Amino acid sequence: VVAYHDTKFRGIDPFDDVVPLMEALHDAGIIIGVITHGLTIKQAEKILRLGLVHLIDPAAIFISDQIGISKPNPKLYTTALKRMGLSPEEALYVGDNLEHDIAPAKSLGMHTAWSTRAAKPGQNTAIVADHTIADFRELAETLRTTYGLDLPKF
């Protein structure tokens, strides 16, 4: 079992534009949070192996298994917002699943960005995110132009 998990996650790397954007946001004092669905041990291991743990406050990681609320239940998002001390209008949720990520976030009034890079085909396109991005370079540009963040180009 250990060998299986080691092999499964050994090749897990973030896309080349993820870490630079997260570092820029972190350096700018922007709170970076994660809302993820799955077993706590597996999701925590993914975050660790992706090398992102130094950029995310552990108190801003919300794993459905640990909280006891699954996506797409908006209560999972409400819990995250409350614990982070944010109103929905102060948050931008980036997700790759229109039904499980974007719809619940939008229902609460959060800003949303649908990442199409790893999105599975056949999603309910009647659900419309505020922004559609192909990669995190596009997300950075959106953060600069729409939300006025002073971020470097990468």
Q: What does each of the following model-derived ranges do?
A:
Residues 19, 23, 31, 35, ...:
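Asp-based, Mg2+/Mn2+-dependent phosphohydrolase catalytic module
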Residues 1-17:
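Metal-dependent phosphoesterase signature
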